[in-house]
Protein backbone atom coordinates (compact mmCIF):
# COMPACT_ATOMS: atom_id res chain seq x y z
CA UNK A 1 0.00 0.00 0.00
CA UNK A 2 1.12 3.60 -0.45
CA UNK A 3 3.17 5.44 2.10
CA UNK A 4 2.14 8.53 3.99
CA UNK A 5 4.41 11.45 4.52
CA UNK A 6 8.17 11.39 4.20
CA UNK A 7 9.23 7.75 4.09
CA UNK A 8 12.81 8.52 5.03
CA UNK A 9 11.75 9.60 8.52
CA UNK A 10 11.41 5.92 9.33
CA UNK A 11 14.96 5.24 8.22
CA UNK A 12 16.60 8.28 9.75
CA UNK A 13 15.57 7.51 13.30
CA UNK A 14 19.20 7.74 14.53
CA UNK A 15 19.05 11.49 13.84
CA UNK A 16 16.75 11.91 16.79
CA UNK A 17 19.80 12.47 18.99
CA UNK A 18 21.39 15.84 18.29
CA UNK A 19 25.02 14.91 17.70
CA UNK A 20 27.39 17.89 17.54
CA UNK A 21 29.64 16.21 14.98
CA UNK A 22 27.85 16.36 11.62
CA UNK A 23 30.31 13.90 10.05
CA UNK A 24 29.48 11.31 12.71
CA UNK A 25 25.77 11.91 12.14
CA UNK A 26 26.18 11.47 8.40
CA UNK A 27 28.10 8.23 8.89
CA UNK A 28 25.33 6.95 11.14
CA UNK A 29 22.74 7.84 8.52
CA UNK A 30 24.69 6.08 5.78
CA UNK A 31 25.18 2.98 7.92
CA UNK A 32 21.46 2.96 8.73
CA UNK A 33 20.51 3.24 5.05
CA UNK A 34 22.94 0.46 4.08
CA UNK A 35 21.57 -1.77 6.81
CA UNK A 36 17.99 -1.15 5.74
CA UNK A 37 18.92 -1.75 2.10
CA UNK A 38 20.34 -5.15 3.02
CA UNK A 39 17.26 -6.09 5.04
CA UNK A 40 14.88 -4.97 2.27
CA UNK A 41 16.90 -6.83 -0.36
CA UNK A 42 16.70 -10.02 1.69
CA UNK A 43 12.94 -9.57 1.99
CA UNK A 44 12.61 -9.22 -1.80
CA UNK A 45 14.81 -12.28 -2.43
CA UNK A 46 12.85 -14.37 0.08
CA UNK A 47 9.51 -13.39 -1.49
CA UNK A 48 10.63 -14.05 -5.08
CA UNK A 49 12.61 -17.24 -4.41
CA UNK A 50 9.99 -18.85 -2.18
CA UNK A 51 7.01 -18.18 -4.41
CA UNK A 52 8.82 -19.14 -7.63
CA UNK A 53 9.63 -22.42 -5.87
CA UNK A 54 5.95 -22.97 -4.99
CA UNK A 55 4.69 -22.18 -8.50
CA UNK A 56 7.37 -24.37 -10.12
CA UNK A 57 6.65 -27.29 -7.79
CA UNK A 58 2.92 -27.26 -8.55
CA UNK A 59 3.54 -26.86 -12.29
CA UNK A 60 6.12 -29.66 -12.46
CA UNK A 61 4.70 -32.38 -10.24
CA UNK A 62 1.30 -33.78 -11.14
CA UNK A 63 0.70 -34.98 -7.58
CA UNK A 64 0.50 -31.34 -6.46
CA UNK A 65 -1.97 -30.28 -9.15
CA UNK A 66 -5.11 -30.42 -7.01
CA UNK A 67 -7.96 -27.92 -7.01
CA UNK A 68 -6.84 -26.45 -3.70
CA UNK A 69 -3.29 -26.08 -4.97
CA UNK A 70 -4.61 -24.18 -8.00
CA UNK A 71 -5.76 -21.58 -5.51
CA UNK A 72 -2.39 -21.82 -3.75
CA UNK A 73 -0.78 -21.04 -7.13
CA UNK A 74 -2.95 -17.93 -7.44
CA UNK A 75 -1.90 -16.87 -3.95
CA UNK A 76 1.76 -17.47 -4.80
CA UNK A 77 1.38 -15.40 -7.99
CA UNK A 78 0.00 -12.49 -5.97
CA UNK A 79 2.93 -12.76 -3.56
CA UNK A 80 5.39 -13.02 -6.46
CA UNK A 81 4.02 -9.88 -8.12
CA UNK A 82 4.30 -8.18 -4.74
CA UNK A 83 7.96 -9.20 -4.54
CA UNK A 84 8.80 -8.16 -8.10
CA UNK A 85 6.71 -5.04 -8.76
CA UNK A 86 5.81 -3.57 -5.37
CA UNK A 87 8.37 -4.16 -2.63
CA UNK A 88 11.49 -3.11 -4.63
CA UNK A 89 9.95 0.24 -5.59
CA UNK A 90 8.73 0.75 -2.04
CA UNK A 91 12.26 0.14 -0.80
CA UNK A 92 13.66 2.59 -3.34
CA UNK A 93 11.12 5.20 -2.28
CA UNK A 94 12.24 4.94 1.33
CA UNK A 95 15.99 4.58 0.77
CA UNK A 96 16.26 7.47 -1.70
CA UNK A 97 13.93 9.73 0.27
CA UNK A 98 12.08 10.54 -2.95
CA UNK A 99 10.15 8.99 -5.81
CA UNK A 100 12.17 8.81 -9.03
CA UNK A 101 9.78 7.03 -11.39
CA UNK A 102 7.23 9.73 -12.26
CA UNK A 103 3.55 10.27 -11.50
CA UNK A 104 2.19 7.64 -13.87
CA UNK A 105 4.24 4.81 -12.36
CA UNK A 106 3.44 6.10 -8.87
CA UNK A 107 -0.28 5.52 -9.37
CA UNK A 108 0.31 2.32 -11.33
CA UNK A 109 2.60 0.99 -8.58
CA UNK A 110 0.02 1.84 -5.92
CA UNK A 111 -2.67 0.08 -7.97
CA UNK A 112 -0.55 -3.08 -8.21
CA UNK A 113 0.03 -2.92 -4.46
CA UNK A 114 -3.71 -2.80 -3.73
CA UNK A 115 -4.33 -5.48 -6.39
CA UNK A 116 -1.95 -7.98 -4.77
CA UNK A 117 -3.38 -7.54 -1.27
CA UNK A 118 -6.96 -7.78 -2.55
CA UNK A 119 -6.25 -10.84 -4.72
CA UNK A 120 -4.49 -12.54 -1.80
CA UNK A 121 -7.31 -12.21 0.70
CA UNK A 122 -10.00 -13.01 -1.87
CA UNK A 123 -8.06 -16.15 -2.80
CA UNK A 124 -7.84 -17.10 0.87
CA UNK A 125 -11.58 -16.55 1.09
CA UNK A 126 -12.12 -18.90 -1.87
CA UNK A 127 -9.82 -21.49 -0.27
CA UNK A 128 -11.96 -21.37 2.87
CA UNK A 129 -15.09 -22.06 0.80
CA UNK A 130 -13.23 -24.81 -1.09
CA UNK A 131 -12.28 -26.52 2.19
CA UNK A 132 -15.85 -26.18 3.44
CA UNK A 133 -17.22 -28.17 0.50
CA UNK A 134 -14.33 -30.65 0.65
CA UNK A 135 -14.97 -31.60 4.25
CA UNK A 136 -18.78 -31.31 4.35
CA UNK A 137 -19.54 -32.90 0.95
CA UNK A 138 -16.59 -35.19 0.08
CA UNK A 139 -18.71 -37.30 -2.29
CA UNK A 140 -19.87 -34.29 -4.33
CA UNK A 141 -16.67 -32.24 -4.01
CA UNK A 142 -15.01 -33.17 -7.31
CA UNK A 143 -18.19 -32.51 -9.28
CA UNK A 144 -18.89 -29.27 -7.41
CA UNK A 145 -15.45 -27.81 -8.00
CA UNK A 146 -13.51 -29.21 -10.94
CA UNK A 147 -10.16 -27.88 -12.09
CA UNK A 148 -11.82 -25.96 -14.92
CA UNK A 149 -14.24 -24.35 -12.48
CA UNK A 150 -11.30 -23.50 -10.23
CA UNK A 151 -9.61 -21.70 -13.13
CA UNK A 152 -12.77 -19.67 -13.73
CA UNK A 153 -12.98 -18.77 -10.04
CA UNK A 154 -9.34 -17.67 -10.03
CA UNK A 155 -9.94 -15.51 -13.12
CA UNK A 156 -12.94 -13.90 -11.42
CA UNK A 157 -10.88 -13.20 -8.29
CA UNK A 158 -8.24 -11.36 -10.30
CA UNK A 159 -10.80 -9.44 -12.39
CA UNK A 160 -12.66 -8.26 -9.29
CA UNK A 161 -9.38 -7.41 -7.57
CA UNK A 162 -8.23 -5.48 -10.62
CA UNK A 163 -11.44 -3.46 -10.81
CA UNK A 164 -11.41 -2.59 -7.10
CA UNK A 165 -7.75 -1.56 -7.20
CA UNK A 166 -7.00 0.02 -10.59
CA UNK A 167 -10.33 1.72 -11.34
CA UNK A 168 -10.57 4.06 -8.30
CA UNK A 169 -6.88 4.97 -8.42
CA UNK A 170 -6.57 5.50 -12.17
CA UNK A 171 -9.83 7.50 -12.17
CA UNK A 172 -8.48 9.60 -9.25
CA UNK A 173 -11.46 8.81 -7.04
CA UNK A 174 -9.06 8.31 -4.16
CA UNK A 175 -7.60 11.81 -4.15
CA UNK A 176 -7.82 14.10 -1.14
CA UNK A 177 -8.33 17.88 -1.41
CA UNK A 178 -6.09 19.30 1.32
CA UNK A 179 -2.99 21.31 0.45
CA UNK A 180 -0.33 18.67 1.17
CA UNK A 181 -2.12 16.14 -1.00
CA UNK A 182 -2.56 18.54 -3.94
CA UNK A 183 1.12 19.51 -3.81
CA UNK A 184 2.16 15.85 -3.77
CA UNK A 185 -0.03 14.96 -6.75
CA UNK A 186 1.61 17.73 -8.77
CA UNK A 187 5.17 16.82 -7.75
CA UNK A 188 6.94 14.18 -9.84
CA UNK A 189 9.17 13.15 -6.94
CA UNK A 190 6.32 12.65 -4.45
CA UNK A 191 4.43 9.36 -4.24
CA UNK A 192 2.83 9.54 -0.81
CA UNK A 193 -0.59 7.91 -0.88
CA UNK A 194 -2.90 10.69 0.31
CA UNK A 195 -6.52 9.52 0.15
CA UNK A 196 -9.90 10.97 0.98
CA UNK A 197 -11.89 9.51 3.85
CA UNK A 198 -14.55 7.86 1.70
CA UNK A 199 -12.00 5.97 -0.41
CA UNK A 200 -9.90 4.86 2.56
CA UNK A 201 -12.90 3.40 4.37
CA UNK A 202 -14.61 1.91 1.30
CA UNK A 203 -11.44 0.34 -0.12
CA UNK A 204 -10.48 -1.12 3.25
CA UNK A 205 -13.93 -2.68 3.64
CA UNK A 206 -14.13 -4.07 0.09
CA UNK A 207 -10.49 -5.14 -0.24
CA UNK A 208 -9.89 -6.45 3.27
CA UNK A 209 -12.55 -6.43 5.97
CA UNK A 210 -15.42 -7.98 4.00
CA UNK A 211 -13.36 -10.92 2.64
CA UNK A 212 -11.81 -11.30 6.09
CA UNK A 213 -15.21 -11.67 7.76
CA UNK A 214 -16.33 -14.23 5.15
CA UNK A 215 -13.05 -16.14 5.47
CA UNK A 216 -13.18 -16.30 9.27
CA UNK A 217 -16.86 -17.28 9.34
CA UNK A 218 -16.51 -20.06 6.75
CA UNK A 219 -13.30 -21.41 8.21
CA UNK A 220 -14.75 -21.50 11.72
CA UNK A 221 -17.60 -23.61 10.33
CA UNK A 222 -15.07 -25.88 8.61
CA UNK A 223 -13.22 -26.46 11.87
CA UNK A 224 -16.48 -27.20 13.69
CA UNK A 225 -17.36 -29.87 11.13
CA UNK A 226 -13.82 -31.28 11.19
CA UNK A 227 -13.89 -31.48 14.98
CA UNK A 228 -17.15 -33.45 14.91
CA UNK A 229 -15.70 -35.83 12.33
CA UNK A 230 -12.63 -36.48 14.47
CA UNK A 231 -14.85 -37.14 17.48
CA UNK A 232 -16.81 -39.70 15.44
CA UNK A 233 -13.54 -41.34 14.41
CA UNK A 234 -12.44 -41.59 18.04
CA UNK A 235 -15.74 -43.22 19.01
CA UNK A 236 -15.62 -45.60 16.02
CA UNK A 237 -12.05 -46.64 16.78
CA UNK A 238 -13.01 -47.20 20.41
CA UNK A 239 -15.79 -49.57 19.36
CA UNK A 240 -13.48 -51.26 16.86
CA UNK A 241 -10.85 -52.06 19.50
CA UNK A 242 -13.46 -53.66 21.74
CA UNK A 243 -14.47 -56.17 19.07
CA UNK A 244 -13.52 -59.81 19.40
CA UNK A 245 -10.25 -60.63 17.61
CA UNK A 246 -11.86 -63.55 15.85
CA UNK A 247 -14.45 -61.23 14.36
CA UNK A 248 -11.70 -58.93 13.16
CA UNK A 249 -9.91 -61.84 11.50
CA UNK A 250 -13.10 -62.91 9.77
CA UNK A 251 -13.77 -59.42 8.44
CA UNK A 252 -10.37 -57.77 8.12
CA UNK A 253 -11.50 -55.51 5.31
CA UNK A 254 -13.85 -53.57 7.56
CA UNK A 255 -10.97 -52.83 9.90
CA UNK A 256 -8.79 -51.83 6.97
CA UNK A 257 -11.53 -49.50 5.71
CA UNK A 258 -11.88 -47.94 9.15
CA UNK A 259 -8.14 -47.33 9.39
CA UNK A 260 -8.08 -45.85 5.89
CA UNK A 261 -11.06 -43.61 6.66
CA UNK A 262 -9.43 -42.48 9.90
CA UNK A 263 -6.20 -41.62 8.07
CA UNK A 264 -8.10 -39.62 5.48
CA UNK A 265 -9.85 -37.43 8.03
CA UNK A 266 -6.70 -37.02 10.13
CA UNK A 267 -4.76 -35.90 7.04
CA UNK A 268 -7.64 -33.62 6.04
CA UNK A 269 -7.58 -32.11 9.53
CA UNK A 270 -3.85 -31.46 9.23
CA UNK A 271 -4.47 -29.77 5.87
CA UNK A 272 -7.02 -27.52 7.55
CA UNK A 273 -4.46 -26.58 10.19
CA UNK A 274 -1.92 -25.68 7.51
CA UNK A 275 -4.40 -23.50 5.64
CA UNK A 276 -5.53 -22.01 8.95
CA UNK A 277 -1.93 -20.99 9.67
CA UNK A 278 -1.71 -19.35 6.24
CA UNK A 279 -4.92 -17.38 6.81
CA UNK A 280 -3.97 -16.49 10.38
CA UNK A 281 -0.53 -15.26 9.34
CA UNK A 282 -2.01 -13.11 6.59
CA UNK A 283 -4.52 -11.60 9.01
CA UNK A 284 -1.90 -10.87 11.68
CA UNK A 285 0.40 -9.23 9.13
CA UNK A 286 -2.18 -7.02 7.40
CA UNK A 287 -4.88 -6.31 10.00
CA UNK A 288 -2.80 -3.74 11.98
CA UNK A 289 -2.10 -1.78 8.79
CA UNK A 290 -5.75 -1.66 7.74
CA UNK A 291 -6.79 -0.57 11.22
CA UNK A 292 -4.23 2.24 11.09
CA UNK A 293 -5.31 3.08 7.53
CA UNK A 294 -8.84 3.90 8.69
CA UNK A 295 -7.75 5.58 11.93
CA UNK A 296 -5.42 7.87 9.99
CA UNK A 297 -8.13 9.33 7.75
CA UNK A 298 -10.42 9.86 10.74
CA UNK A 299 -7.77 11.38 13.01
CA UNK A 300 -4.85 12.62 10.92
CA UNK A 301 -2.20 13.17 13.57
CA UNK A 302 -2.97 10.21 15.82
CA UNK A 303 -0.71 7.65 14.08
CA UNK A 304 2.97 8.53 13.46
CA UNK A 305 4.11 8.14 9.87
CA UNK A 306 6.87 5.78 10.99
CA UNK A 307 4.29 3.39 12.46
CA UNK A 308 2.26 3.48 9.24
CA UNK A 309 5.31 2.60 7.14
CA UNK A 310 6.46 -0.12 9.54
CA UNK A 311 3.05 -1.82 9.53
CA UNK A 312 2.96 -1.57 5.73
CA UNK A 313 6.24 -3.48 5.58
CA UNK A 314 5.00 -6.09 8.03
CA UNK A 315 2.28 -6.75 5.45
CA UNK A 316 4.88 -7.00 2.70
CA UNK A 317 6.87 -9.57 4.68
CA UNK A 318 3.80 -11.83 4.78
CA UNK A 319 4.47 -12.66 1.12
CA UNK A 320 7.64 -14.48 2.20
CA UNK A 321 5.94 -16.55 4.91
CA UNK A 322 3.62 -18.76 2.86
CA UNK A 323 6.33 -20.92 1.18
CA UNK A 324 7.71 -21.65 4.65
CA UNK A 325 4.26 -22.67 5.88
CA UNK A 326 3.79 -25.01 2.92
CA UNK A 327 6.78 -27.00 4.20
CA UNK A 328 4.36 -28.54 6.72
CA UNK A 329 3.15 -30.62 3.79
CA UNK A 330 5.25 -33.75 3.05
CA UNK A 331 4.32 -33.41 -0.63
CA UNK A 332 5.64 -29.86 -0.82
CA UNK A 333 8.73 -30.73 1.23
CA UNK A 334 9.67 -33.52 -1.16
CA UNK A 335 8.97 -31.31 -4.19
CA UNK A 336 11.08 -28.45 -2.82
CA UNK A 337 13.95 -30.81 -2.02
CA UNK A 338 13.79 -32.29 -5.49
CA UNK A 339 13.79 -28.87 -7.17
CA UNK A 340 16.72 -27.71 -5.03
CA UNK A 341 18.63 -30.94 -5.73
CA UNK A 342 18.63 -31.77 -2.02
CA UNK A 343 16.99 -35.14 -2.54
CA UNK A 344 18.19 -37.72 -5.06
CA UNK A 345 15.31 -38.59 -7.36
CA UNK A 346 12.85 -38.48 -4.47
CA UNK A 347 9.90 -37.65 -6.66
CA UNK A 348 10.91 -40.06 -9.40
CA UNK A 349 9.71 -42.90 -7.22
CA UNK A 350 7.08 -40.63 -5.69
CA UNK A 351 5.50 -39.88 -9.05
CA UNK A 352 6.08 -43.14 -10.93
CA UNK A 353 5.79 -46.02 -8.47
CA UNK A 354 2.02 -45.79 -8.49
CA UNK A 355 -0.14 -44.23 -11.16
CA UNK A 356 -3.87 -44.13 -11.74
CA UNK A 357 -5.43 -45.20 -15.01
CA UNK A 358 -8.34 -43.54 -16.72
CA UNK A 359 -10.83 -45.67 -14.82
CA UNK A 360 -9.61 -44.38 -11.50
CA UNK A 361 -7.89 -47.71 -10.66
CA UNK A 362 -4.29 -47.96 -9.63
CA UNK A 363 -1.46 -49.48 -11.68
CA UNK A 364 1.63 -50.65 -9.84
CA UNK A 365 5.17 -51.46 -10.85
CA UNK A 366 4.82 -55.05 -9.71
CA UNK A 367 6.45 -54.77 -6.32
CA UNK A 368 3.90 -55.53 -3.58
CA UNK A 369 5.48 -53.09 -1.16
CA UNK A 370 6.90 -50.58 -3.61
CA UNK A 371 5.55 -47.59 -1.76
CA UNK A 372 7.51 -48.51 1.35
CA UNK A 373 10.88 -48.50 -0.36
CA UNK A 374 11.50 -44.88 0.69
CA UNK A 375 12.61 -44.87 4.29
CA UNK A 376 12.01 -41.21 4.98
CA UNK A 377 9.12 -40.17 7.19
CA UNK A 378 7.65 -38.13 4.38
CA UNK A 379 7.33 -41.23 2.20
CA UNK A 380 5.80 -43.15 5.08
CA UNK A 381 3.20 -40.43 5.48
CA UNK A 382 2.42 -40.50 1.78
CA UNK A 383 2.23 -44.30 1.41
CA UNK A 384 1.21 -45.77 4.72
CA UNK A 385 -0.56 -48.89 3.44
CA UNK A 386 0.46 -51.05 0.47
CA UNK A 387 -2.92 -51.29 -1.28
CA UNK A 388 -4.32 -54.56 -2.45
CA UNK A 389 -6.27 -55.10 -5.60
CA UNK A 390 -9.45 -54.29 -3.78
CA UNK A 391 -8.35 -50.77 -2.86
CA UNK A 392 -9.16 -48.45 -5.74
CA UNK A 393 -7.15 -45.52 -4.44
CA UNK A 394 -3.83 -44.04 -5.47
CA UNK A 395 -0.88 -45.13 -3.38
CA UNK A 396 0.30 -41.70 -2.16
CA UNK A 397 -3.16 -40.65 -0.95
CA UNK A 398 -5.38 -41.93 1.80
CA UNK A 399 -9.11 -41.73 1.33
CA UNK A 400 -12.03 -43.35 3.06
CA UNK A 401 -13.04 -46.62 1.47
CA UNK A 402 -16.58 -45.37 1.06
CA UNK A 403 -15.30 -42.52 -1.12
CA UNK A 404 -15.27 -44.87 -4.10
CA UNK A 405 -18.49 -45.50 -5.94
CA UNK A 406 -19.43 -48.70 -7.76
CA UNK A 407 -17.78 -47.51 -10.98
CA UNK A 408 -14.47 -46.97 -9.24
CA UNK A 409 -14.61 -43.18 -9.26
CA UNK A 410 -12.72 -41.56 -6.46
CA UNK A 411 -14.55 -38.75 -4.68
CA UNK A 412 -11.84 -37.94 -2.20
CA UNK A 413 -10.25 -34.52 -2.09
CA UNK A 414 -6.78 -36.11 -2.34
CA UNK A 415 -5.45 -32.86 -0.98
CA UNK A 416 -1.68 -32.51 -1.07
CA UNK A 417 -1.58 -29.75 1.52
CA UNK A 418 -1.17 -32.38 4.23
Curated annotation (Swiss-Prot):
Glycans are attached at residues 6, 15, 23. One of its GO terms (biological process) is cellular response to amyloid-beta. GO terms for molecular function: adenylate cyclase binding; amyloid-beta binding; beta2-adrenergic receptor activity; norepinephrine binding; potassium channel regulator activity; protein homodimerization activity; protein-containing complex binding. Keywords: Cell membrane, Disulfide bond, Endosome, G-protein coupled receptor, Glycoprotein, Golgi apparatus, Hydroxylation, Lipoprotein, Membrane, Palmitate, Phosphoprotein, Receptor, Transducer, Transmembrane, Transmembrane helix, Ubl conjugation. Residues 400-418 have a biased composition (Polar residues). The chain crosses the membrane at residues 38-58, 71-91, 108-128, 152-172, 198-218, 275-295, 307-327. A lipid is attached at residue 341 (S-palmitoyl cysteine). The modification 4-hydroxyproline is found at residues 387, 400. Phosphorylated by PKA and BARK upon agonist stimulation, which mediates homologous desensitization of the receptor. PKA-mediated phosphorylation seems to facilitate phosphorylation by BARK. Phosphorylation of Tyr-141 is induced by insulin and leads to supersensitization of the receptor. Residues 1-37, 92-107, 173-197, 296-306 are extracellular. The modification Phosphotyrosine is found at residue 141. Residues 389-418 are annotated as: Disordered. Binds NHERF1 and GPRASP1. Interacts with ARRB1 and ARRB2. Interacts with SRC. Interacts with USP20 and USP33. Interacts with VHL; the interaction, which is increased on hydroxylation of ADRB2, ubiquitinates ADRB2 leading to its degradation. Interacts with EGLN3; the interaction hydroxylates ADRB2 facilitating VHL-E3 ligase-mediated ubiquitination. Interacts (via PDZ-binding motif) with SNX27 (via PDZ domain); the interaction is required when endocytosed to prevent degradation in lysosomes and promote recycling to the plasma membrane. Interacts with CNIH4. Interacts with ARRDC3. This is Beta-2 adrenergic receptor. It comes from Cavia porcellus.
